[in-house]
A protein has these predicted regions:
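Bacterial N-terminal signal peptides that target proteins for export
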Residues: 2-14
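C-terminal motif of bacterial Sec signal peptides marking the signal peptidase cleavage site
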Residues: 22-24
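Mature catalytic domains of secreted/periplasmic carbohydrate-active enzymes
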Residues: 26-501
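Accessible peptide chain termini
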Residues: 1-2, 351
Length: 501
């Protein structure tokens, strides 16, 4: 009999619960389609860098409170161990208004005199008409080295960024009369990038939103479980597929158990054979119903805390999980045996937060380190921009992205089209991250570097060594270390040593 640690056992219990949730779907994904969803298309494996865009009516108040989530803290918020009263996400502004003790609720009362959230719609749409230029966005994303773009087409507030033919039964005309999804898709693809759509599948606050209990419980219980909502999500997702053929289908907060997920997956892959999906498709509405049972929320929190106590458990795969795994303001402690995508904002929020300053943003070196570390661990980075209500990407967000683009222009071959090596880092000396192709091993040395520097030897035979962006004048190997002399010191923030195999 095999014995498991408490954390590993908890992980297996979570997998079992996930499979139960999947079985609860009225139309579960077939084994064949599930396997197809886990086969990553080569373009996605090679792309490494994507741009996420959160933009909508919440960009008008542009208010959220709190510092960025730390690794693992999102789960702590969900499992009730965080002291936070509200997420630092602008796109959750409407949810924060539900609780009078939040900073967002106080701000809304002071600035907007508690006006209904729907009042932001005409303001947002007028601003978009005045200021948005999708071609300029696409030019900028291409210049920073992005290979794909994922637009939030509907967030939890239910507002759609395209003129949907599927009527919201609870809120008339709750969507853009302008086809912003189509305009951006055309602009992005015209510049050779792929285009994907995010759609809030599990939550839509125009259908239901609770605020009378434990906040974790409220989020779970707010996932609509009705047949009406399942049909609505299916119809809008199918409409997105028909209109835009998204290369990425990005779900969030689960998928309604009555939403015909199996049929949707089969339809998507038939229409977009080279497409891919993420992993957030569990039947969260079933979880919400369980959360309504006395004591059930406590048990789920306890199970989650147990699982989170061991980082190694996160590296284990879940056979019921579709698509690539997502990590939000988080990472892994090693190289997972599955493809994954790290996503976060440049600051604490995904949507534009007018309170944030340049000091709240990732610096260019931090963003480069984030990308390099993720790619070395078999991941892609989907870095978010939050435009203001006029569609302008703030300068403080542009700055780190431009720095990343400059670095990628020199060192992109160590990122694009690479795969993880047998290990992601070195064991001694300077911090290094490894990537590889059939012809080369890349050692990406993190941090500023002098004209002469020393790193640990990878311990493999090679034909020759280069340093990208510089001329290598001299190389000495001694006691498992390599010392290299460049013609000029590179400014950093990371340099790439290429071992030609």
């Amino acid at each position: 009999m095999k014995c498991y640690s408490r954390a590993a056992l908890a992980h297996r219990l979570v997998i079992a619960i996930t499979m139960v949730f999947t079985a609860a779907c009225t139309d579960p994904v077939s084994e064949e389609t599930l396997a197809r969803s886990r086969e990553m298309p080569q373009w996605y494996e090679d792309a490494k860098l994507g741009i996420f865009i959160h933009w909508g009516p919440s960009s008008v108040p542009a208010f959220a409170f709190g510092p960025p989530l730390q690794p693992g803290e999102l789960e702590e918020v969900m499992f009730g161990d965080s002291p936070r009263k509200e997420l630092p996400y602008v796109e959750w502004y409407l949810n924060a208004l539900n609780y009078p003790d939040t900073e967002a609720a106080r701000h809304h009362a002071e600035v907007y005199d508690n006006a209904p959230y729907t009042d932001f719609k005409p303001i947002y749409e007028a601003h978009v008409s005045e200021g948005w230029d999708p071609a300029a966005w696409a030019d900028f994303f291409h210049s920073v080295g992005a290979k794909y773009v994922v637009l939030v087409t509907k967030h939890h507030d239910g507002y759609t960024l395209w003129p949907s033919a599927v009527t919201n039964p609870n809120r008339e005309n709750w969507g853009s009369p302008r086809d912003m999804v189509g305009e951006l898709a055309a602009a992005v693809r015209a510049r050779g990038m792929r285009f994907g759509t995010y759609y809030s599948t599990g939550l839509d606050w125009t259908f239901q939103m609770y605020n009378d209990g434990d906040r974790v419980q409220d989020i779970m219980r707010s996932a609509p479980a009705s047949q009406e909502y399942g049909d609505y999500v299916f119809a809008q997702m199918k409409e997105l597929i028909d209109r835009y053929r998204p290369d990425v289908l990005w779900a969030d907060i689960g998928f309604p158990s009555k939403g015909r997920q199996g049929e949707l997956f089969e339809y998507y892959f038939a229409q977009v054979p080279n497409g891919t999906v993420n992993d957030r498709w569990g039947a969260v509405d079933v979880l919400g119903q369980i959360a309504s049972i006395p004591g059930a929320t406590w048990a789920m929190k306890a199970l989650g805390r147990l699982m989170l106590s061991n980082q190694s458990a996160k590296l284990e795969d879940d056979p019921a999980r579709p698509g690539f795994k997502t990590a939000e303001y988080d990472s892994f402690a090693g190289i997972p045996p599955f493809k994954w995508e790290a996503t976060r904002g440049l600051g604490a929020s995904f949507g534009f937060n007018a309170r944030e300053t340049a000091a709240d943003m990732l610096t260019a070196p931090e963003l480069i380190d984030f990308l390099v570390d993720t790619v070395a661990k078999n991941g892609n980075v989907l870095i978010n921009v939050g435009p203001d209500s006029y569609g302008r990407i703030p300068v403080i967000q542009q700055a780190p992205l431009r720095g990343l683009g400059d670095w990628m222009a020199v060192n992109g071959e160590a990122i694009y089209g690479t795969r993880p090596w047998i290990r992601y880092n070195n064991e001694h000396g300077r911090a290094v991250r490894y990537t590889k192709t059939d012809k080369a091993l890349y050692a990406i040395v993190l941090g500023a570097t002098d004209q002469s520097f020393t790193i640990e030897s990878p311990g493999i035979p090679w034909k020759s060594i280069d340093v990208l962006g510089a001329e290598l004048m001299q190389t000495e190997e001694e006691d498992g270390s390599l010392t290299m002399l460049l013609d000029n010191p590179l400014p950093g923030p990371a340099i790439v040593v290429r071992y030609n195999l």
